[in-house]
């Protein structure tokens, strides 16, 4: 409810969540002991999934050194790089980004291909992307165009974000 409707309900009372609201989660791909797996419907509610590799040696050195002297969270002296108001402003700016009907059809073609059992790779896909993937591609392509300094979406914007939007929504078959 929080992720989809930006509200929570306790008993008969509903509370709107403050803006900006977003959920970030981490996943350890190796250790699954004591971990509760999320069902596909909940995983689908995450807009994107970004996979990070190991840090560069110099970054890992800094992490190592800072953690040796770490006493409490405040010791890191983290500072906000953007205000909540700026996040809301940027989110609203994406609404003004133009997305042509041809790009919308391109997005629908990408998503629907994951559902075609008779396609070249159909036997390897147990469950294709839901309509939430189309919505996520639509939103993220606009955000990518904005980040690239454009007020319109091009196919490259969709290609740039497609893997992060779709990777957690495609369930592979045993084949």
Residue ranges: model-predicted function:
Residues 3-97, 142-144:
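Canonical AAA+ ATPase core
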Residues 44, 105, 138-139:
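Short alpha-helical basic/polar micro-motif
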Residues 63-64, 107, 111, 161-166:
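Short alpha-helical scaffolding segments that buttress acidic/His motifs in well-ordered protein cores
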Residues 67-70, 110, 175:
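A short, terminal or domain-edge coil/loop segment
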């Amino acid at each position: 409810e929080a992720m989809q409707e930006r509200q929570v309900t306790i008993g008969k009372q509903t509370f709107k969540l403050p803006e900006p609201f977003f959920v970030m989660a981490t996943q350890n791909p190796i250790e699954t002991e004591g971990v509760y797996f999320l069902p596909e419907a909940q995983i689908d509610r995450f807009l994107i999934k970004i996979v990070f590799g190991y840090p560069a040696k110099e970054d890992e050195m800094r992490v190592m050194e800072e953690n040796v002297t770490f006493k409490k969270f405040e010791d890191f002296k983290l500072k906000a790089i953007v205000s909540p108001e700026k996040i809301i402003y940027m989110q609203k700016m994406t609404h003004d980004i133009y997305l042509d009907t041809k790009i919308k059809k391109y997005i629908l073609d990408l998503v629907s291909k994951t559902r075609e059992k008779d396609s070249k790779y159909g036997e390897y896909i147990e469950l294709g992307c839901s309509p939430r993937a189309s919505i996520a591609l639509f939103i993220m392509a606009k955000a990518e165009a904005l980040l690239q300094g454009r007020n319109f979406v091009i196919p490259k914007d969709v290609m740039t974000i497609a893997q992060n939007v779709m990777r957690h929504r495609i369930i592979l078959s045993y084949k």
